[in-house]
Amino acid sequence: FAHRCSVDAAEKVNKISFQNNIPDWDAEGTSQPGEMILITQSLKELQLVMSDYVGIVRNDIRLQRASRRLDLLWEETEQLYQTSTLSPQLLELRNMITVGYLIVKGASFRKESRGLHYNTDYPGKSELVQNIVL
């Protein structure tokens, strides 16, 4: 499979037009984050939110609380993102919050308990197996 993918990619790469006039990053108006602790603390908070509210056992109230806390984390991180020079830690945090949103949203759509994910509001397994596409 990997060989077929590489052959296909090699055939198509010359048909792609690449944009060469992309401007360099402009860091004007941004500064180094004065306190990396803001990023570190937000990461710890994200881990706690996901573990406490969106773990193996969950319910609709926990998922709603997780969503609200992710909203706050996103706002704080976005403000830092807009005013700071980019760092791998800041970008990772933004990406992890986005993944957290997707997990919470997918869990909110599922109105059943299946596999290792048990929702106390919906303890039974649905007859219909559904894939959640976000």
Which residues fall in each region the model found?
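Glycine- and aromatic-enriched mobile tails/lids
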Residues: 1-134
